Amino acid sequence: MSSSTPNTLPLLSTNKSLSSPFTNNHSTFLSKPSQPFLHGRRCQSFKVSCNVGEHDKNLDAVDRRNVLLGLGGFYGAANLAPLASAAPIPPPDLKSCGVAHIDDKGTEVSYSCCPPVPDDIDSVPYYKFPPMTKLRIRPPAHAADEEYVAKYQLATSRMRELDKDPFDPLGFKQQANIHCAYCNGAYKIGGKELQVHFSWLFFPFHRWYLYFYERILGSLINDPTFALPYWNWDHPKGMRIPPMFDREGSSLYDEKRNQNHRNGTIIDLGHFGKDVRTPQLQIMTNNLTLMYRQMVTNAPCPSQFFGAPLGSDPEPGMGTIENIPHTPVHIWTGDSPRQGHGEDMGNFYSAGLDPLFYCHHANVDRMWNEWKLIGGKRRDLSNKDWLNSEFFFYDENRNPYRVKVRDCLDSKKMGFDYPPMPTPWRNFKPIRRSSSGKVNTASIAPVSKVFPLAKLDRAISFSLTRPASSRTTQEKNEQQEILTFNKMAYDDTKYVRFDVFLNVDKTVNAEELDKAEFAGSYTSLPHVHGNNDNHVKDVTFTLAITELLEDIGLEDEDTIAVTLVPKVGGEGVSIESVEIKLEDC
């Protein structure tokens, strides 16, 4: 991820006129104003309006799988211990905003990421939603027509033009700097770095961030109904960079992207620095499996989906979607082959300089809504410390505001929503099995003989005793079985990913994730902590496995086999112990 040279964006000529040569191709996708979808029933199939190429044959092949489309078949219910107390996070002190850092060597971002400080900084009011006449409906980017694309390009061009004044809070670079300041150590609270990743602040911060960014774009083209598109990477037909972002010379294009991942290349939602030599159909299948695991299996309750409370530790633990696919999409898009620090998308400080960042996070935000629709105990957190945490933003009129988490829980109340769309991962529970029966756990070393583990430099297997077996349905609803990795340490300036499997040994084919035995993955994106020289991260990693044990047929077993397969950076990962716990939701 880049050297100390910042991304330089071209300054466009000033044009205050709101007239523009929109392309009118009579598309049914979008009519003025920008209202691509209204309300409707969730559909079972979806036709895209963008042109398709040869690679779409594989997309259709995935569509033909009889488990791809349709809803239903979910397992809700229990999980995780109640959230620990952590004081509400106040908005950052802009007057003490400092230097942001890029890497563990102390490399400073060569420009200030701090926002302009308003004259009345000590009396910034709370934001109140303006009157709304109709919802802004965020469309899937891959299906957008040329009229919509022209509007989006124009709005982004005008935002870039505002960079003439480097202190204009509505300028493209100033908007990108919001992410840099909140994520690369520029803000401190109580002497600790303020970080909006790796905790329960992740979803609400980015929702508010996109809310104001979207409204600024709309104001620049006098269209209050303009809505950001979302990168539909959870659907096979959206698993590539949306075409509107891959046009050189467009205001939506960013030179600092991985050039090997352009022109319709299928994204790997588990990507961590290395391209897999796997057929496209298998990559898409793996993607849908990852989505099912992250949204359904591993996130039956709020604490696993949102992440851990932010307290004295600036990075207490991320939720399932932040882990995967959020982070791998950043890495896959960023230009790590040519840039020293993965710019733009591959580093927090520069991610907002790529317009695709906002499209990516629109789909991350959409996952918040989709997750709550699955049911069970999937609902917003009720912890007051979370609800009362605050952030600072400028609105489209350059007015400064404070905002609270509690006011962003319902996207419709904020004035935006997503159209009814198929979510094929909902019915993509892995059903194929690697083995026909139970692995002989007596032939595998017990956990006490394997841990503490000094380094995960190769695949390892071990047997683990469960706290209870043959649990009733009521017991499962009350408590989730949690596979827990205690005191896991690694250098958090390095890429890390390893996969976890149950009921298989270390000979498992880890390139095929669409197996019932695949439990989940752990990932980490390189990042820094301001001036902190200690980059060894000590975390607890958990996976909810109640559903998994049912699917594999191990509910009545007292002992199970667990296999860890390192993908990237395993040689730097140590784990003190592993256990299975029963925890309340």
UniProtKB/Swiss-Prot annotation:
Gene3D superfamilies: Di-copper center containing domain from catechol oxidase. It is found in: Plastid, Chloroplast thylakoid lumen. GO terms for molecular function: catechol oxidase activity; metal ion binding. The keyword Chaperone does not apply. Pfam families: PPO1_DWL, PPO1_KFDV, Tyrosinase. Its EC number is 1.10.3.1. It catalyses: 2 catechol + O2 = 2 1,2-benzoquinone + 2 H2O. Keywords: Chloroplast, Copper, Disulfide bond, Metal-binding, Oxidoreductase, Plastid, Thioether bond, Thylakoid, Transit peptide. Cu cation B binds at residues 326, 330, 361. Residues 1-86 form a transit peptide. PROSITE patterns: TYROSINASE_1 (PS00497), TYROSINASE_2 (PS00498). It is an enzyme of class 1 (oxidoreductase). Cu cation A binds at residues 179, 197, 206. One of its GO terms (biological process) is pigment biosynthetic process. Binds 2 copper ions per subunit. Its main location: plastid. Its cofactor is Cu(2+). Disulfide bonds join 97-114, 113-180. There is a cross-link at residues 183-197 (2'-(S-cysteinyl)-histidine (Cys-His)). GO terms for cellular component: chloroplast thylakoid lumen. Coiled coil: none annotated. Catalyzes the oxidation of mono- and o-diphenols to o-diquinones. Belongs to the tyrosinase family. This is Polyphenol oxidase F, chloroplastic. It comes from Solanum lycopersicum.
